[in-house]
Each structure stands twice: as structure tokens, then as C-alpha cells.
Amino acid sequence: MTPGTQSPFFLLLLLTVLTVVTGSGHASSTPGGEKETSATQRSSVPSSTEKNAVSMTSSVLSSHSPGSGSSTTQGQDVTLAPATEPASGSAATWGQDVTSVPVTRPALGSTTPPAHDVTSAPDNKPAPGSTAPPAHGVTSAPDTRPAPGSTAPPAHGVTSAPDTRPAPGSTAPPAHGVTSAPDTRPAPGSTAPPAHGVTSAPDTRPAPGSTAPPAHGVTSAPDTRPAPGSTAPPAHGVTSAPDTRPAPGSTAPPAHGVTSAPDTRPAPGSTAPPAHGVTSAPDTRPAPGSTAPPAHGVTSAPDTRPAPGSTAPPAHGVTSAPDTRPAPGSTAPPAHGVTSAPDTRPAPGSTAPPAHGVTSAPDTRPAPGSTAPPAHGVTSAPDTRPAPGSTAPPAHGVTSAPDTRPAPGSTAPPAHGVTSAPDTRPAPGSTAPPAHGVTSAPDTRPAPGSTAPPAHGVTSAPDTRPAPGSTAPPAHGVTSAPDTRPAPGSTAPPAHGVTSAPDTRPAPGSTAPPAHGVTSAPDTRPAPGSTAPPAHGVTSAPDTRPAPGSTAPPAHGVTSAPDTRPAPGSTAPPAHGVTSAPDTRPAPGSTAPPAHGVTSAPDTRPAPGSTAPPAHGVTSAPDTRPAPGSTAPPAHGVTSAPDTRPAPGSTAPPAHGVTSAPDTRPAPGSTAPPAHGVTSAPDTRPAPGSTAPPAHGVTSAPDTRPAPGSTAPPAHGVTSAPDTRPAPGSTAPPAHGVTSAPDTRPAPGSTAPPAHGVTSAPDTRPAPGSTAPPAHGVTSAPDTRPAPGSTAPPAHGVTSAPDTRPAPGSTAPPAHGVTSAPDTRPAPGSTAPPAHGVTSAPDTRPAPGSTAPPAHGVTSAPDTRPAPGSTAPPAHGVTSAPDTRPAPGSTAPPAHGVTSAPDTRPAPGSTAPPAHGVTSAPDTRPAPGSTAPPAHGVTSAPDNRPALGSTAPPVHNVTSASGSASGSASTLVHNGTSARATTTPASKSTPFSIPSHHSDTPTTLASHSTKTDASSTHHSSVPPLTSSNHSTSPQLSTGVSFFFLSFHISNLQFNSSLEDPSTDYYQELQRDISEMFLQIYKQGGFLGLSNIKFRPGSVVVQLTLAFREGTINVHDVETQFNQYKTEAASRYNLTISDVSVSDVPFPFSAQSGAGVPGWGIALLVLVCVLVALAIVYLIALAVCQCRRKNYGQLDIFPARDTYHPMSEYPTYHTHGRYVPPSSTDRSPYEKVSAGNGGSSLSYTNPAVAATSANL
């Protein structure tokens, strides 16, 4: 190959490489899709396993959109702050950047802004009238309020300080972020605040009378206590100060947030509050006569009792403080949030509250006669009872307090949120509420006659009872406090949030409420005659019943409290949020509400005649029924409480949030609401005639029905409570948030709402005539219907509650958030709303005539319809609830957020809104004539249309629910089983989806989009690809008919809001229109709508409807729409006129799918380039050939030799002659030898040549 032909090959190779690179870029930039135009969305057709099919997908629509009216952008990291609003009258600004701060409101009248940047600080309100701003940037500080009248700002940037309030009247700011300061007490008479953020300073008290501030940010300073009478503030930022007690008579507040402070008691007569947030402070009792509050948030402080006569509150949030009792006569509250404080009782006569949030404090009882509340949030405090006669409340939030009963006659409420408190009953005659959320506090009863509330959220506090006659509340948030019962006659509430408190019953006659949120408290019954509510949120409290005649509410949020019934005649509500409390029934005649949020409390029934509500949020409480005649509400949020029924005649509400409470029914005639949020409470029905609401949030409570005639609401958020119905005639609401409660219906005639958020509660219906709302958030509660005539709302958020219907005539709302509750319908005539957020509740319909709203957020509740005539809204957020329709005539809204609820329609005539947020609920339509809004946010609910004539708005933000959905201008009728349609946001567009063909039950998907394009009035959408549980993706046949429909809404005015999809006006109208069309075109051929546009002229609505080809024509589209105009006017308040329908071509440019794909275009370009290169090469080759002919032949290698070496010539020639170069005629003698060069200039000897030739 010549050099002239090489260069084109190099050029061709270079161009080929560049072409391949360029083609790859094009191919990768167009992955099966095309770019959007400014006004129209085009859809690509991805590869499919089937040919001749159009699969319309959208890569720009999102099924997740901000709620209506929300200006939050998608994907924005928003941190939840449950309650950051300033109190009434406050001029404070709202908390900025607050993270999970349940209560950061400044006190009433305070001008301080709420906590700014606070993290997980449940309560940091400054005291009432305080001008101090709340804690700023505080982390996990449940209560940082300065004392009443104090001007000091709350702890700023404090970490994990449950209560940072300075002592009452103190101007000193609470201890700020102190860690491990064993004793940081200022000297006696000192006005200096305790160690502030001190680190490892064994003794940081300033000298007596010193005005110097303690070491600030000092590390390992053995003694930083200010001297007695010193006004200097304690060391700031000191860690590990063994003794943080202020001296006797000192007004300085104790160390705040100190860790590992064995003794943080202020000296006798000291007014300084005990160490706040101290960790591992064995003894944090203020000295006798001291007014300082006990250590707050101290960890491992064996004894945090203030001295006798001290007014200081007990250690708050102390950890492992065996004894946090204030001294006798002390007014200091018990340790709050203390961990492992065996004894946190204030001294006898002390007014200090018991340890609050103490962990492992065996005894947190305030001393006899003490007014201090029991330990609050104490962990493992075996005895947190306030002393006899103490007014301190029992430990609040104590864990593992076997006995959190206030002493007999105590007014302290039972342990609240105690875990594993076998007995949290307030003493007999006690008015203290049962342990609330206490964990494993064997005995947190306040002493007899004590007014202190039981241990609240205490952990493992064996005995946190205030002394007899004590007014201190029981340990709050204490952990493992075996006995947190207030003493007999105590007014302190039982341990709140205590864990593992076997007995949290207030003493007989106690008015303290039962343990609230106690875990594993076998007995949290308030004593007989006690008015204390049952344990609230207690875990594993076998018996949390208030004593007979007790007015304390049952254990609230108690876990595993076998018996949390208030004593007979008790007015205490049943255990609230108790876990595994076999019996949390208030005693007979008790007014205490049943256990609230109790877990595994087999029996949380208040005693007969008790007014206490059933266990609320109790887990595994087999029987949480308040006693007969009790007014206590059923267990709220109780888990596994087999029977949480208040006793017959009880007014206590059923168990609220109870888990696994087989029977949480309040007794007959009880007014207590059914178990609320109870888990696995088979029977949480209040007794017949009970007014207690059904179990709220109860888990696995087979029967949480309030007794007949009960006014208690059904179980709310109960889990697995087979029957949480309040008794017939009960006014208690059905179980709310109950899990697996087969029957949570309030009894017939009950006014209690159905179970709310109940899980697996087969029957949570309030009894007939009950006004209790249906189970709210109940899980697996087959029947949570309130009884007929009940006014209770249907189960709200119930899970797997087959029947959560309130009884007929019930006004209770349907189960709200119930899971797997087959029937959560309130009874006929019930006004209760349908189950809200119920999961797998087949029937959560309130009874006929019920006004209860349908199940809200129910999961798998086949029927959550309120009964006919019910005003309850349909199930809201129900999951898998086949029928959540409120009964006919019900005003309850349809199920909200229901999952897989085949039928959540409120009954005909119901005013309840359709299921809201329901998942897989085939039918969530409110009944005809219902005013309830359709299901909101329902997923896979084939039919959640409000019935014809219903005034309820369609389903809002429903996913895969064929009925109606709000929050979206586009819906999908999806025929697949458990198929999910995915969408992504596009410019002002709405999703458009294609159904699968694997089921006969249609489902719908509604999603709202807020992303906009350049056009303010143009809407476009791309059909989302739907998927199902089948191996092949669902496909749509190529035959699709599109119709352009426009109409005028004459009663609305067009404004700029309809040009901005983020406005409430725009979203509401768009949602209403979407839902309306879902109701109009219900046949299987309807595929969805898109391109909703609003124009001036009143309001002109233009949109595009899609149907399967051949299923409908223009005339039918217009006819069906005109027939529904009157319904739209009544339901959506839309006066429609000038309807125009026309057949239009496919608006989404689906034909583009038949074109050349991107890779094909890239390949075509590559081929074109290669062809061009070949043409260039051929042209170059032709040019070279032409040039060669024009310029002659260049002989690079000539054939002739021009040089011959002389060696070829002979040296001697005899007959040689000269041969001329041009001579051709040679003689043989003159020829040149071929071997001699062949040159014409050579001489040849003929003889030699001949001889050579012949050789």
C-alpha cells in the first residue's frame, strides 16, 4: 500500500472512535425516555414482556406529596416537635429548629419563646408566670420549667434533663447539663444554684457563705459545693461530683444533669432543689427541712430522699438511686427520672414529689406525710412510695416497680407509664392515679393517706409508694420499682411510666389513678375506694386495679400488668398504656379509668362501679375492665391485657393503647372509655352501663367492649384485643389504636368511641347505645363496633380488628388506625367516627345511626362501616379493612388512612368522611347520605367511595383505592391484587395509572403533585407504571379512549391561588374534583384523569378522562357526569354547569413509543458517519488515481543498472571493440555478456564470452 493510501485509513479510524464515544453518550442520555416539553408530558414505552402493549410511566410524578396546604418541599428534613407552642397568653415566639420536644410550651402567661433548637425535651415549660425562655437547644429534657414565679430561664442546651425546674420561688436557673457529679450540694443556707454542667467534680460546694460561683466547666474537681448561705452558682459543666447536696437551708437548686452523684441531698433545711439530671447518685435526699427538690434526672442514686421536712422535690430523672425519698416532712418532689434508685420516697410529711423518671430506684416513696410527688421517670426503684401522709405524687414513668399502689387513702395517682410493676394499686381510699408508664416497679404505692401520684415512668423501682398520708405523686418514669404504691390514704398518683411493677394498685380508698404506662406490673389496681386512675402505660403489671372504692384511673400505658383494675368503687381510670398487666380493673365502684397503654395486663378492669377509664395503651393485660359501675375509662394503649373491662356500671374508659388484653371491658354501667391503644387485650369492654371509652391503642385485647350502657369510648390504638366493646349503654369510646382485639365494641347503648388504633381486636364495638368512638388505631380487632346506639367513634388506627363497629345508635367514631379489624362498625345509630388508621379490620362500621367517624388509619379491617345513621367518619388510615363503612345515616367520616379495608363506607345517610389514608380497603365508601369525607390516604382500598348522598369528602390521598381519594387530581382504577401504582411529580400534574388485570376488585391510586412547569394553568401527567404481586408487570391494551371534559363551577371564584398548586385552595379543589370523578366513573373501563386546569370564569375546570377503548362513549361520559351534579353540589359544595365533553386523541403522545428508540437513533448516526467516511475515502482514492495519470509514471525502482563495478571488466582484451550504446545490430563477437553487467558501454571478448556461455 502506497503512502498515498495510508492517511485515509488513519482518518477513518479516528472518526470511528469519536463516533462510538459520541453514540454512547447519546444512548446513555436517553434511557428509554424523552425530555419533557414545557407544557406537555410525553411518556416513553419501556421494554415489556408483552408486545403491542402500552405501558405508560411517569418519571416525574410522585405519589408522595406534601399534604394539603403544606408548603414543605418534598424530601425536606423536617424534625418533629410534638408540642412547641407557647402557653396561653404567652408572647413567646415559636420554637425554632426544635427536635422531638413533646412539651416545650412556656407556662401560662409566660412571654418567653419556646425552646429553640431543643431536642427531645418532653416538657421544658417555664413555670406559670415565668418570663424565662424555655430551654434553648436542650436535648431530651422532659421538663425544664423553672419553678412557679421564677424568672430564671430554663436549662439552655441541657442534655437528657427530664425536669430542670428550679425549686418553687427560686430565682436560680436549673442545673445546666451537669454530668456525673455525686454530690454538688451548696452548703446549708446557700442560695447558689447547684453544679451547672459540672464534670467529675466529687464535691464542688463553695465554702459556707461564699458568693463565688462554683467551678464553671471544671473537670474532676473533688468538692465544688458552695458554702452554706453562699449565693454562688454551682460548678458549671463539672462531671462526676460525688456529693452535690446543697448545705442545709441552702436555696440553691441541686446539680442539674449531674452523672454518678451518690448523694445529692441538700442539707437539712436547705431550699435548694436536689440534683437535677444526676447520674449514679446513691443518695440525693435533701436534708431534713430542706425545700430543695430531689435530684432531677440523676442516674444510679441509691437514696435521693430530701431530708425530713424538706420541701425540695425528689430526684428527677435520677438513674440507679436506691433511695430517693425526701426526708420526713419534706416538700421536695421525689426523684424525677432517676435510674436505679431503690428508695426514692420523700421523708414522712415531705411535700416533695417522688422521684420522676428515676431508673432502678428500689424505694422512691416520699416520707410519711410528705407532699412531694413520687419519683417521675425513675428506673429500677424498688420502693418509690411517698411516706405516709405525703402529698408527693408517686414515681412517674418508673420501670420495673412491682408494687406502685399508693398507700390506703392516698390521693396520689398510680404509677404512670410504669413497666413491669406487679402491683401499682394506690392504697385503699387513695386518690392518686395508678402508675403511668412505669417500668418494673414492684411497689410504687404512695403511703397510706398520701396525695402523691404513683410512680410515673419509673424503671425497676421495687417500692416507690409515698408514705401513708403523703400527698406526693408516685414515681414518674421510674424503672424497676417493685413497689410504687402511694401509702394508704395518699393523694399521690400512682407511678407514671413505671416498668415491671407487679402491683401498682393504689391503696384502698385512694384517689390516685392507676399506673399509667407501667410495664410488667402484675397488679396496678388502686386500693378499694381509691380515686386514682389505673396504671397508664405500665408494662407487665399483673394487677393494677385501684383498691375498691378508689377513684384513681387504671394503669395508663402499663406493660404486662396482669391485674390493673382499680379497686371496687374506685374512680381511677384503668391502666393507660400498660404492658402485660393481667388484671388492671379498678376496684368495684372505682372511678379510675382503666389502664392506659398497658402491655400484657390480663385483667385491667376497674372494679365494679369504678369510674376509672380502662387501661390505656396497656400491653397484654388479659382483664382491664373497670369494676361494675366504675366510671374509669378502659385501658388506653394497653398491650396483651386479656380483660380490661371496667366493672359493671363503671364510668372508666376502656383500655387505651393496651396490648394483648383479652378482656378490657369496663364493668356493666361503667362510663370508662374502652381500652385505648391496648395490645392483645381479648376483652377490654367496659362493664354494661359503663361510660368509659373502649380500649385506646390496645394490642391483642380480644374483648375491650365497655359494659352495656357504658359511655366509655372503644379501645383506642389497641393491639390484638379480640373484644374491646364497652358494655351496652356505655359512653366510652371504642378501643383506640388497639392491636389484635377481636371484640372492642362498647356495650349496647354505650357512648364510648370505638377502639382507636387497636391492633387485632376482632370485636371492639361499643355496646348498643354507646357513645364511645370506635377503636382508634386498633390492630387485628375483628369487631370493634360500639354497641347499637353508641355515640363512640369507630376504632381509630386499629389493626386486624375484624369487627370494631360501635353498637347501633352509638355516637362513637369508627376504629381509627385499626389493623386487621374485620368489623369496626359502630353500632347502628352510633355517632362515632369509623375506624381511623385501622389495619386489617374487616368490619369497623359504626352501628346504624352512629355518629362516629369511620375507622381512621385502620389496617386490614374488612368492614369498618359505622352503623346505619352513624355520624362517625369512615375509617381513617385503615389497612386491609374490607368494610369500614359507617352505618347508614352515620355522620362519621370514612376510614382515614385505612390499609386493605375492602369496605369502609359509612352506612347510608352517614355524615362521616370516607376512609382517610386507607390501604387496600376494597370498599371505604361512607353510606349514602353520609357527610363524612372519603377515606384519606387509603392504600389499595377497592371501594372507599362515600355513599350517594353522603356529604363526606372523598378519600384523601388514597393509594390504590378505587373509591375516592383526595389530595390528587388523578386517580387510578387498579384491578390488581395488592398492586401498587407508583408516580412521581410532574409539572402541575397528577398521576395517571393503568390497572392490572389480575383481580376483579378495582382499586384506586390517588396522589397529589405539586411540581410545576412554566405554564401556570397547564396540567399534564404521565401514566404511572403499575405493579402487582404477580411475576409480570400489569399491562394495558393499546385501545385507550380519551375524552376532554370541561365544566363551570359557578359558586367558586377564580383567583391567583388556582394558579399555584401549592396553595390550599388549589389542592382542595383539585382533590375534590379527583374524588368526584372517582365516584362518578366506577366501572372497570375508567383508567383515570389528568391535565386538570383551572381557568377564569367563576372557575372553569378542564381535564382529560381515560377509558378502555370501547367501554364508553361521549354521550355516556356526559350523561353519567350530569347525573352526579346534584350529589357533587351537596357533597363537595360545587355547583356545576356548562358541561362539555368531546372525544380527543391520545394526549400523552403515546405514539412516540412506536418510534425509533434512542439507541436506534445513535446507531443510525453511527452508520451515517461511517457511510460518510467511506464516501470521503473513495473520493480521496479517486483523486489520487487521477493525479497519477496526469503527471506520468514515477519509476521509483528503475529496471536498468547505471553503475557497474570495474571488477566485471577483464583487464586484458585482445580482440575487443567498442560497442556504441545505441547499437542494436551486433555481431556475435560484439555481444555483451549478460553476466558482465549488460551495459552497452562494456567491452566483450567474443572468445571469453563464448567460453563463458558454454561453461
Curated annotation (Swiss-Prot):
Chain positions carrying an annotated carbohydrate: 131, 139-140, 144, 957, 975, 1029, 1055, 1133
Extracellular topological domain: 24-1158
Oligomeric and partner information: The alpha subunit forms a tight, non-covalent heterodimeric complex with the proteolytically-released beta-subunit. Interaction, via the tandem repeat region, with domain 1 of ICAM1 is implicated in cell migration and metastases. Isoform 1 binds directly the SH2 domain of GRB2, and forms a MUC1/GRB2/SOS1 complex involved in RAS signaling. The cytoplasmic tail (MUC1CT) interacts with several proteins such as SRC, CTNNB1 and ERBs. Interaction with the SH2 domain of CSK decreases interaction with GSK3B. Interacts with CTNNB1/beta-catenin and JUP/gamma-catenin and promotes cell adhesion.
Protein name: Mucin-1
GO CC entries: apical plasma membrane; chromatin; extracellular exosome; extracellular space; Golgi lumen; nucleus; plasma membrane; vesicle
Gene3D superfamilies associated with the record: 6.10.140.600
Stretches for region 42 X 20 AA approximate tandem repeats of P-A-P-G-S-T-A-P-P-A-H-G-V-T-S-A-P-D-T-R: 126-965
Coiled coil: none
Miscellaneous field: The name KL-6 was originally that of a murine monoclonal antibody reacting with pulmonary adenocarcinoma cell lines and pulmonary epithelial cells. This antibody recognizes a sialylated carbohydrate chain on MUC1.
Protein topology in the membrane: Single-pass type I membrane protein
Record-linked InterPro entries: SEA_dom (IPR000082), SEA_dom_sf (IPR036364)
SUPFAM superfamilies (alphabetical): SEA domain
Gene name of the encoded protein: MUC1
SEA domain span: 1039-1148
Keywords: Autocatalytic cleavage, Cell membrane, Cytoplasm, Disulfide bond, Glycoprotein, Lipoprotein, Membrane, Nucleus, Palmitate, Phosphoprotein, Repeat, Secreted, Signal, Transmembrane, Transmembrane helix, Tumor suppressor
SMART domains: SEA
Residues at the site labelled Cleavage: 1097-1098
Tree of life domain: Eukaryota
Organism phylogeny: Eukaryota, Metazoa, Chordata, Craniata, Vertebrata
Pfam families: SEA
Effect of residue 1223 to A: No change in PRKCD- nor GSK3B-mediated phosphorylation
Signal peptide from the UniProt entry: 1-23
